[in-house]
Amino acid sequence: MNGSSNSGSPGGGQTGDDDGTGFDLATETRIKTKKPSLYRVLLLNDDYTPMEFVVFILERFFNRSREQATRIMLHVHQKGVGLCGVYTYEVAETKVAQVLDLARRHEHPLQCVMEKED
């Protein structure tokens, strides 16, 4: 092989930087990926939804233990709002829809919302 038809690399590569040896130098390009925005899923207090139903919601849709769910439920009851979890947009949207759907099927006025984290 005389190299006269070779354009820089043994495989005839046409990319990279030639260092004068007749071979291309491999260059590494790092692609920076943007982290997805996160959203807080919040439960809002009302005077009608049973506390036990709120605990059930937290256990079922947010994978909380009975103790964690009870603590969050009491926080919602006392402060008016409580954090269920922080998720990507699609996951948060799904969880809000699941909570609202189950609450409506049980005829409870429970409100669940999502808001973007700063």
From Swiss-Prot:
Disordered: annotated span: 1-24
GO biological process: protein catabolic process; proteolysis
Pfam families reported for this sequence: ClpS
InterPro entries hit by this protein: ClpS, ClpS_core, Ribosomal_bL12_C/ClpS-like
Protein purpose: Involved in the modulation of the specificity of the ClpAP-mediated ATP-dependent protein degradation.
PANTHER family: ATP-DEPENDENT CLP PROTEASE ADAPTER PROTEIN CLPS (PTHR33473:SF19), ATP-DEPENDENT CLP PROTEASE ADAPTER PROTEIN CLPS1, CHLOROPLASTIC (PTHR33473)
UniProt cross-references to NCBIfam families, sorted A to Z: PRK00033.1-2, PRK00033.1-5
Family recorded in the similarity comment: Belongs to the ClpS family.
Subunit structure: Binds to the N-terminal domain of the chaperone ClpA.
Name the record gives this protein: ATP-dependent Clp protease adapter protein ClpS
Lineage, highest ranks first: Bacteria, Pseudomonadati, Pseudomonadota, Alphaproteobacteria, Hyphomonadales
